[in-house]
Amino acid sequence: MAPPLPILIIGAGISGLTTARLLTNSGIPNIVFEASSPDRRQGFAISLREWGYATLLSALGDLPLRSLTRGVAPDREIGGSGWIDQAVWDNGTAKKLFVPDANSSTKEQIVRANRNALRRWIADCGEEELDVRYGHRLKRVEGSLGDVQVEFENGAFYRGLMVVAADGVNSTVRSQVLADVQPEIVPAVLYHGEFQLPRADFDRLFRPHTGESNILAGVGDGFNTPFAVCNMTKTHVHMDWSYSRPAWGSGENDPLYRPNLASEEAKRIPPALVEELASRDLAEPWSLFLNGEAIQHHRVFHWAVRCVSVTQEDMQRAVGRGIAFVGDSWHAMPIFGGEGGNHALADGVELAAAVAAGVAGDLGVAIGNYYDRAWKRSQDAVRRSKQRFYALHRPMAQWRELSQKKPV
């Protein structure tokens, strides 16, 4: 008797690896294909909300939260737990605007996770090693549920029961199966920088503001400048910063709103960014690192802010083709104000559970059940994330009004 066809997972990000790990733990054959090399760098940190990480820990056998934070927290090497205080600071005065009520019954616990470390941790949460094949960039996907075929640019060809599209906002699977679904560009400016500094300098410049928190959330008059710890050791701290704001007007006359930049151009620092940072009159520590001279020594990227939305009819079409979408491939959200990583975890957990329940019966019904559960959750989140992006970039007068209602 021929062995069962595997489930083919395109993309080794958070959603793809979560799906693969849980399928593997359930004894369901699967292969993960990743376009990049094993040493790809994506070491920035993301925020995991309680509902997101609790879902994952439960699916992995009710693991304790400490198991996760020991493996993924940016400050794990010095015994930290990825804690953030959720405080909001005025980046023009270096004064704290407000802190969410720590005693509130509605305050959700949030932990920071280094993205590279999170992928490794998920992959390692089981006795059987995952089958991840790097250097496989998808060329085409054909067939239907029960017998799908995928071909890669390196000439490799595979057949499987179904395809899990975990290939991100610019999903190749989606472009072939749901060609009419295109990412929506949010009219926003977002620059991201990475730098490293000695631990002693971090303790001197940042600790007076952050304490043990892994984020220093600075806001200005319609713009944001958060600092975040990506990885911390006893001697050095790898950090990142972001500079973000809504585009001016339609964006046509905004020198920093450039949503269609080529990848190499997106790594260059435009003079307009240097000029704009200089005009912001930032207080320390923001002014020490967000200036024209300092950022020349940082790895700086321009990030286009994109969203992806789908209809229930789109998902029904995908079921017939044997495609299950997870993560940003079907619900990309703005980096600021979004909860994409949390929904990626939830997708992987819910899809793996649905497939495990239906693989011996009607797999189409199983995928349909997954979409029925996940569609509203994720698509509502896409809509909320766009609204939250603008709320997080409000005028300073509104921030100060909020601070009167939520005093420090």
Swiss-Prot record:
Its EC number is 1.-.-.-. The keyword Flavoprotein applies. The keyword Nucleus does not apply. One of its GO terms (molecular function) is FAD binding. Glycans are attached at N91, N103, N170, N231. InterPro entries: FAD-bd, FAD/NAD-bd_sf. Keywords: FAD, Flavoprotein, Glycoprotein, Monooxygenase, Oxidoreductase, Signal. It comes from the Eukaryota. FAD binds at E34, A45, R119, D328, G341. Its cofactor is FAD. Gene3D superfamilies: FAD/NAD(P)-binding domain. Pathway: Secondary metabolite biosynthesis. Residues 1-20 form the signal peptide. PANTHER family: FAD-DEPENDENT MONOOXYGENASE APTC, MONOOXYGENASE, FAD-BINDING. FAD-dependent monooxygenase; part of the gene cluster that mediates the biosynthesis of neosartoricin, a prenylated anthracenone that exhibits T-cell antiproliferative activity, suggestive of a physiological role as an immunosuppressive agent. The non-reducing polyketide synthase nscA probably synthesizes and cyclizes the decaketide backbone. The hydrolase nscB then mediates the product release through hydrolysis followed by spontaneous decarboxylation. The prenyltransferase nscD catalyzes the addition of the dimethylallyl group to the aromatic C5. Belongs to the paxM FAD-dependent monooxygenase family. This is FAD-dependent monooxygenase nscC. It comes from Neosartorya fischeri (strain ATCC 1020 / DSM 3700 / CBS 544.65 / FGSC A1164 / JCM 1740 / NRRL 181 / WB 181) (Aspergillus fischerianus).
